[in-house]
Each structure stands twice: as structure tokens, then as C-alpha cells.
């Protein structure tokens, strides 16, 4: 089953989408992520990029194109799997790898949850305060 979450536009006609979420209220986003197993993030340019972090917090895994914003906290084969932008076959292979390798999937989930814990707002607030001290 494939879900598509967007704040701007509907999926293209050729996308195979079972569920489409548009403009989800912030307090409901976690529920959407928790209903999914794998996040595929294809953005090539972003700032910090929260979706993989949100997916980790809900116990899911991410297959991601590395970009300036997400490489601050994502590590290939540690808390996500990377694939090269535009290489659809590599993206599919990464998803299949996660589906077929429970040990890898469990490792990425565990490390992803550690990463998400490190980026909780309360911890980030303290890090910002420490910078100004």
C-alpha cells in the first residue's frame, strides 16, 4: 500500500497511490507516519528536512536522496538508506533490501529512534542555550 503526503500538490496521474494526504494538521502528522513502514524522500534540495526524522520517531525507516539538509543527521546504513538522485532502480533496490533483511531493518529502526531522541525539541533548546553561554 502506498501513501502520498504533500502540502502543495496532488500526486501526478501516473503515480500509483492508495492514500493521499494533503495539508495534514501538524498534530496528526505522527499518526500518518506511524501508519507507514518506509518513507521514500526524493528531495534534492532542502534545509533541515524533518520527514525522515519524523519517520524515525514513529519507528519507521527512510530511503532517502542525500541533500544539504538531511545529511546533518542521516547516515547511510545506520539510520536510513541513501540512494542517488534520479536512480529509481537504486531506490527500489533499497526498499527491497529493507523488506528482505529484517536484521538491517531492525538496526536502522533502533538507530533511527536514537537519532530522533537526540533531536527532540527539549534537547535542541538546551543545545541552543549552551551555544549562547
PLM-predicted stretches and their roles:
Residues 103-132:
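A charged, aromatic-enriched C-terminal amphipathic alpha-helix characteristic of glycosyltransferases
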Residues 4-30:
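Nucleotide-activated donor-binding/catalytic signature segment of Leloir-type glycosyltransferases, i.e.
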Residues 76-77, 81-88, 97-102:
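Conserved acidic donor-binding segment of nucleotide-sugar-dependent glycosyltransferases
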Residues 61-64:
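Short hydrophobic beta-strand element within catalytic cores of glycosyltransferases
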Residues 39-40:
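A short hydrophobic beta-strand element within the catalytic core of glycosyltransferases
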Residues 31-36:
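Short alpha-helical donor nucleotide-sugar binding micro-motif in glycosyltransferases
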Residues 30, 53-57, 71-72:
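Short alpha-helical segment that forms part of, or immediately flanks, the ligand-binding pocket
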Residues 44:
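Aromatic "clamp/platform" in nucleotide-sugar-dependent glycosyltransferases that forms part
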Amino acid at each position: 500500500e502506498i501513501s502520498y503526503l504533500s502540502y502543495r500538490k496532488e500526486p501526478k496521474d501516473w503515480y500509483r497511490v492508495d492514500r493521499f494526504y494533503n495539508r495534514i494538521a501538524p498534530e496528526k502528522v505522527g499518526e500518518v507516519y506511524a501508519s507507514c513502514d518506509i518513507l521514500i524522500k526524493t528531495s534534492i534540495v532542502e534545509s533541515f528536512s524533518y520527514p525522515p526524522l519524523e519517520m524515525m520517531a514513529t519507528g519507521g525507516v527512510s530511503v532517502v536522496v542525500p541533500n544539504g539538509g538531511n545529511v546533518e543527521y542521516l547516515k547511510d546504513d545506520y539510520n536510513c538508506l541513501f540512494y542517488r538522485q534520479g536512480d529509481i532502480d537504486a531506490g527500489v533496490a533499497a526498499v527491497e533490501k529493507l523488506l528482505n533483511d529484517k536484521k538491517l531493518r531492525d538496526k536502522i529502526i533502533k538507530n533511527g529512534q536514537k537519532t530522533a531522541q537526540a533531536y527532540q525539541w527539549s534537547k535542541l533548546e538546551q543545545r541552543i542555550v549552551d551555544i549562547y553561554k
